[in-house]
Curated annotation (Swiss-Prot):
Bilayer-crossing regions: 61-81, 155-175, 203-223, 238-258
Organism field: Pyropia yezoensis (Susabi-nori)
Domain of life the protein comes from: Eukaryota
Membrane topology: Multi-pass membrane protein
Molecular function terms from GO: antiporter activity; proton transmembrane transporter activity
Reaction equation(s) it catalyzes: K(+)(in) + H(+)(out) = K(+)(out) + H(+)(in)
Protein known as: Potassium/proton antiporter CemA
Intracellular or extracellular location(s): Plastid, Chloroplast inner membrane
Length: 278
């Protein structure tokens, strides 16, 4: 029974787009089933298939996203963490992996010195010697050195654990072709079950979020976080080049998908999208 369900789901997942919009064919199919004398038994069977499809899809989606995260954390803290900490402390630890870390450390130390100087100017009555100020700055420099040394070691751990997570994700994708077909069918049923207004709203939401007027600021933050996570230099030229090209590519893909695919599947949703976007 389960094998037959998966076979049906595979057919739904890889159903090709015909010349007639799917919304029209679905309406005629629903009308035909209502006139069918065996419609009740078919409805029960379709409910069983839908329930099995939902359970399988939710399980596989959770497996697909939770497994790499768990493997990432486990490999980072129990495998790569102890090894890298041991090797990192064997000799004189390397504090900085790139120039961006140096700039942030120097800027923070400079702000600390300026803060001390400001406090001295506000309280001229207090007898603060140059040796005390120098000692406080020295302690702050050691604190920053330890912080950025740990950040550099964590960046190496992140690279190795992320590679393992990617391998686990790819392995799950390769070995779960049947489950992927079920998930595709499940997502198609959800998307096509939405109203035209809901479809248009989601399209506008995602396009404005990722390729809209304010999206470059979000992309800039995301790229900076990723580069810092991997211990790579936060090159402003690379970041500006990325946010000036990647959103344009995404916008082109969105428009092509609307023109090539959604326009055939649900032309009423495309019309609603254009009306809402004007």
């Amino acid at each position: 029974m389960k094998y037959w369900n998966l076979k049906r789901n595979n057919q739904f997942a890889f159903e090709k787009v015909g010349p007639i919009p799917r919304s029209i064919t679905n309406t005629f199919e629903k009308f035909r089933k209502e006139l069918d004398p065996n419609g009740e038994s078919e409805a029960i069977e379709e409910f069983r298939i839908s329930r099995h499809q939902t359970i399988t899809s939710v399980k596989y989606i959770l497996l697909l996203f939770i497994s790499p995260v768990l493997v990432n954390q486990a490999s980072k803290f129990f495998v790569f963490g102890p090894c890298i900490d041991y090797l990192w402390n064997q000799e004189q630890p390397k504090i900085f992996l790139n120039s961006s870390q140096e700039e942030r450390a120097f800027a923070e130390l400079q702000r600390f010195e300026e803060k001390i100087h400001f406090e001295v100017l506000l309280n001229p009555s207090e007898d603060i010697s140059y040796e005390i100020i120098e000692k406080r700055v020295q302690l702050k420099a050691r604190e920053l050195g330890e912080y950025y040394a740990n950040e550099s070691a964590n960046a190496v751990k992140n690279i190795l654990s992320d590679l393992v997570s990617i391998l686990v994700f790819i392995l799950l994708m390769i070995t779960g072709q049947r489950q992927i077909a079920v998930v595709k069918s499940f997502l198609n049923e959800i998307i096509y079950g939405l109203s035209d207004t809901a479809k248009a709203f989601l399209i506008i939401l995602f396009t404005d979020m990722f390729v809209g007027f304010h999206s470059p600021h979000g992309w800039e933050v995301i790229i900076e976080v990723i580069l810092r996570h991997l211990g790579l230099p936060e090159s402003r030229d690379f970041i500006f080049l990325f946010i000036s090209t990647f959103p344009v590519i995404l916008d082109t893909i969105f428009k092509y998908w609307i023109f090539r695919y959604l326009n055939q599947v649900s032309p009423s949703a495309v019309a609603t999208y254009h009306n809402m976007n004007e």
